[in-house]
């Protein structure tokens, strides 16, 4: 579809394809190499390995949700440059998704069985945020990323120092998420009301606690 302006229907179809790729197939990425490439894993106990698997499953579920949030916002964004920024961020989130999926498998764990639910719910939230206006949509991105950074920091505190591959992935994700937040604010994002922040935090806890086990 290069060379012509995409219609809203085109974007809906592309979003549907991205949803299928994210939840069931191979998502679109910029093909950046995993930070864990070439990093040796230390001697993990069975307990440490199980904990890492559960936490990386949570991170994978979070990236499924992040991908959906960005795609939902891109679909309803009013300004073309905002839409493109959301789509580019979604590609980078997909890199995180692939990295986490690979690491989950290496740890002998499985990704969340509720992936379609995480994607669908987050896509709707993202679309609604986009409909509220670009400044609020960008503010939503910034707050989401701030919360994700804190969440990653908590995981880094729990994952064994012997699990160098998982830690390398999380450190890079933390850096990327912090940058997304800064870019969103610099592009005109506004700070969200404390009540919205609290609601976002509560929803995040439900997802992380559920994905830890399922």
UniProtKB/Swiss-Prot annotation:
Keywords: Cell membrane, Iron, Membrane, Metal-binding, Monooxygenase, Oxidoreductase, Ubiquinone biosynthesis. The keyword Oxidoreductase applies. Its EC number is 1.14.99.60. It catalyses: a 5-methoxy-2-methyl-3-(all-trans-polyprenyl)benzene-1,4-diol + AH2 + O2 = a 3-demethylubiquinol + A + H2O. It is a peripheral membrane protein. Belongs to the COQ7 family. Catalyzes the hydroxylation of 2-nonaprenyl-3-methyl-6-methoxy-1,4-benzoquinol during ubiquinone biosynthesis. This is 3-demethoxyubiquinol 3-hydroxylase. It comes from Nitrosococcus oceani (strain ATCC 19707 / BCRC 17464 / JCM 30415 / NCIMB 11848 / C-107). The lineage of its organism: Bacteria, Pseudomonadati, Pseudomonadota, Gammaproteobacteria, Chromatiales. The gene is coq7.
């Amino acid at each position: 579809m290069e060379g012509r302006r995409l219609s809203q229907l085109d974007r809906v179809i592309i979003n549907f394809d991205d949803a299928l790729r994210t939840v069931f197939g191979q998502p679109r990425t910029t093909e950046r190499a995993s930070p864990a490439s070439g990093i040796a894993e230390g001697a993990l106990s069975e307990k440490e390995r199980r904990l890492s698997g559960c936490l990386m499953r949570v991170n994978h579920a979070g990236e499924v949700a992040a991908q959906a949030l960005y795609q939902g916002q891109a679909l309803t964004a009013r300004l073309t440059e905002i839409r493109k920024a959301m789509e580019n961020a979604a590609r980078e989130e997909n890199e995180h998704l692939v990295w986490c999926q690979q690491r989950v498998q290496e740890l002998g764990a499985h990704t969340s069985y509720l992936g379609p639910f995480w994607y669908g719910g987050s896509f709707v939230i993202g679309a609604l945020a986009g409909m509220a206006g670009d400044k609020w949509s960008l503010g939503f991105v910034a707050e989401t990323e701030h919360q994700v950074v804190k969440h990653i920091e908590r995981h880094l505190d729990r994952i064994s120092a012997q699990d160098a591959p998982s830690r390398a992935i999380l450190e890079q994700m933390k850096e990327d998420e912090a940058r997304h937040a800064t870019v969103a604010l610099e592009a005109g994002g506004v700070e969200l009301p404390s009540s919205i922040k609290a609601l976002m935090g509560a929803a995040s806890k439900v997802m992380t606690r559920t994905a830890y086990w399922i």
